[in-house]
């Protein structure tokens, strides 16, 4: 296990800056997730740590050693890709043992490493099968086994679950987290799926347009987003945003409807109120905001409502079965502690 430090890391392609002075400390044994929309630079950053992409500026330090010019094989890292990158003409056993074999390790030592990895990943029944004979989840476990036998100081995962169906993704993210808890290794994991980030990470790094937006524990980001982008990106279903103004302890929409907000948000100014779907509650008649119902989705334990408030699309999740019809107008509100206020122009919290 080693610490990884990124100090002012930048990446440019000609005049295009794709990563802008990234500063980040990954602790030894930490499971750190880089999350953000496509094109935010997260995979490029991971490839720079791996040595697959040259660094344009700044310093990469692995285990106290500057690694900018260190070749990938000297960094003592292992990477699991989105595509499984398995040799089709080799069995699972041969794929897992390929690295030690080409490094000239003894056959008995290689076999022991393969057996150890297979035990961790529950792969013994599949070791003599070829990749074409394995399911997507089994192939990904073989790819993980190939990483484990390297006995690396740092594991890198580049969207490893993107090619799997929804059920397999849930299963595999549980297995990857269990693997980390067993090996206690340093993990840097890239995904665009914030559910993966929330359920797996010790800390999350939210990125957008080549910059870090916020770093923190999953629930810290959920409860205290640093800006409107983080608030809208973290959470599923995502936060709804309603434009209006803040004045004298109330948030007012353009329709004249208002709800109480925190006392710290006093002072008239244009703002947006962010409310998470599960924080909406039915208000008394004539109070709160008016939700115009468009679509109702009963799921059994919950009722999901898609509609509009002050003309803006919102989603509300109620923890009970309620009977509503499209076009119906429902008074809703939220506790002031659950209303996130953002400046209309900057997107920063008020």
Curated annotation (Swiss-Prot):
The keyword Nucleotidyltransferase does not apply. It is a peripheral membrane protein. Gene3D superfamilies: 2.40.50.100, Nucleic acid-binding proteins (2.40.50.140), P-loop containing nucleotide triphosphate hydrolases (3.40.50.300). GO terms for cellular component: ATP-binding cassette (ABC) transporter complex, substrate-binding subunit-containing. The lineage of its organism: Bacteria, Pseudomonadati, Pseudomonadota, Alphaproteobacteria, Hyphomicrobiales. This is Putative ATP-binding protein BRA0745/BS1330_II0738. Residues 4-234 form the ABC transporter domain. Its main location: membrane. Pfam families: ABC_tran, TOBE_2. Belongs to the ABC transporter superfamily.
């Amino acid at each position: 296990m080693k610490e990884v430090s990124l100090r002012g890391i930048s990446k440019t392609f000609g005049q295009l800056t794709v990563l802008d002075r990234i500063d980040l400390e990954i602790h030894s044994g930490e499971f750190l997730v880089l999350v953000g929309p496509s094109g935010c630079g997260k995979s490029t950053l991971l490839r720079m740590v791996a040595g697959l992409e040259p660094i344009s500026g700044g310093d990469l330090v692995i285990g106290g050693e500057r690694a900018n010019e260190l070749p990938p094989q000297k960094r003592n890292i292992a990477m699991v890709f989105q595509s499984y990158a398995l040799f089709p003409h080799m069995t699972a056993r041969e794929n897992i043992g390929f690295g030690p074999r080409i490094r000239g390790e003894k056959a008995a030592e290689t076999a022991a490493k393969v057996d150890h990895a297979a035990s961790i990943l529950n792969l013994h029944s599949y070791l003599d099968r070829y990749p074409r004979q394995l399911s997507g989840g089994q192939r990904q476990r073989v790819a993980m086994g190939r990483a484990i036998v390297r006995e690396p100081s740092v594991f890198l995962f580049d969207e490893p679950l993107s090619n799997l169906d929804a059920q397999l993704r849930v299963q595999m993210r549980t297995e990857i987290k269990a693997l980390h808890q067993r090996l206690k290794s340093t993990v840097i994991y890239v995904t665009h799926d914030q559910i993966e980030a929330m359920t797996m990470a010790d800390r999350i790094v939210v990125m957008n347009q080549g910059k870090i937006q916020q770093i923190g524990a999953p629930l810290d980001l959920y409860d205290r987003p640093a800006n409107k982008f983080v608030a809208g990106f973290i959470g599923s279903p995502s936060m709804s945003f309603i434009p209006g103004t803040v004045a004298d302890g109330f948030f007012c929409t353009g329709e004249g409807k208002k709800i109480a907000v925190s006392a710290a948000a006093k002072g008239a100014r244009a703002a947006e109120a962010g409310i998470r779907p599960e924080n909406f509650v039915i208000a008394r008649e004539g109070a709160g905001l008016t939700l115009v119902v468009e679509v109702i989705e009963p799921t059994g334990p919950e009722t999901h409502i898609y509609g509009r408030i002050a003309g803006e699309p919102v989603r509300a999740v109620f923890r009970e079965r309620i009977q509503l019809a499209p076009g119906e107008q429902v008074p809703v509100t939220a506790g002031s502690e659950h209303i996130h206020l953002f400046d209309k122009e900057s997107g920063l919290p008020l």
